[in-house]
Amino acid sequence: DMVMESDRSEFVIVYGRRRVGKTFLVDQYYQGSYDFTFVGGHNLSRQRQLTSFGKALKKFSGSKPDKFSDWFDAFDALEEYLELLDADRKKVVFIDEMPWIDTQKSDFVSALENFWNGWAARRSDIVFIASGSATSWMVDNLIENQGGLHARITSSIYVRPFTLHEVEEYLQRKHCKWDRYQILQCYMVMGGIPFYLSLIDPRQSLVQNVDRLFFSHGGIMRGEFDELYNALFSNAELYISVVKALAQHHDGMTRTEISKVIGANGGTLTRVLTNLERCDFISRSQNFGCKTKDTIYRLMDFYTL
C-alpha cells in the first residue's frame, strides 16, 4: 500500500529462487490489474524478446505493434503508451523473469537505466516492478548496480521458501491428514518450495506422492533438477558438479577441496560459489580464528539434497 500511495515513482524488485512464488505474490496483490506486463522468455534471442515485448504492448495499448530495433526503442514506446493514461493514478508496470531478457549484448540494462532515470523517476505516478529467479543477476544488475541504476531501487522483496511450520500450515489448508513425521519428511524432500507443495495430492501418502511426482513416467518433478539449474545459471553443468560434490560431504568442503573435485578455480569458482550462496543452495561458515581459505561450504537446499 505504501508503494501505491507514495508521492514518487517506485522501483520495486521481487527476487528469490525459481518456483518460490514471486509471480504469484505480485499477481495476488495487484489482482492482475497491470497497465503493462511482460514476461521474459528463456533462451530467446534479443529480437524475439523484442517482438514479444511489442505484442504485449499491443495487447495493452490496442495499437499496432512496432518493430523495435533495440531496447531503447521498446522503452520509448512504453513511455508513449503510459503517458496516454490517466495522470491522476499510479500506473503499474510488471516485468517478470527480467534476467532472461538481458541476453548477450542486448543493451537491455542500459535502456532500463535510461527509461527509469530519464523518464519514470522524474514523475510521481509509476510503479515499476521487476522480478526474476536468477538472484545473482538481480543483485548485480539492480540491487548492487554501480552504474545508472545505483541506489535507484526504492523497495525490494526477497521471497524465501516456506519454513517447516509454514509447510505444516499449508498442508493443513490442503486438508492433508499426514502426521508430523510425514510433514517433516515432505519438507526434507520438497524444501518448502510452494510450487512443489502445490503438486501434492492430499488423498495419497507421502510415499505415493513422491513416487508419482518423481519416479513415474511423465512425473512432473522427474526432470526438475536439470531444468532448475539450467534456468538459473549459464554453464549449469559446473554448478551441478559443485552441488553434487557437496552432497557427498555432509560436513562440508573447503574451496580447495571443491576445486580439486570439479577442476575449476580462480574467478570461475568464486562466481559459482557466490551465485549458489545467493540462491540459498549453499551456505558458508568459518570457524573462529581460521583463515578465509578454510571457509566451509555446505549444501543447504533440501530439494537438491
What are these regions (language model features)?
Residues D7-V12, Y34:
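Pre-Walker A (Motif I) flank of P-loop NTPase domains
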Residues T154-Q182:
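Conserved small helical "lid"/interfacial subdomain of P-loop NTPases
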Residues K22:
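Conserved lysine of the Walker
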Residues F195-Y196, I200-L305:
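Accessory nucleic acid-recognition modules appended to NTPase machines
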Residues V12-Y15, R19, W100-Q104, F108, ...:
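Sensor-1/coupling segment of RecA-like P-loop NTPase cores
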Residues L25:
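Hydrophobic positions on the alpha1 helix immediately C-terminal to the Walker A/P-loop
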Residues G32-D66, E79-E80:
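Conserved NTP-binding/hydrolysis module of P-loop NTPases
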Residues D1-D7:
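Pre-Walker A adenine-sensing motif
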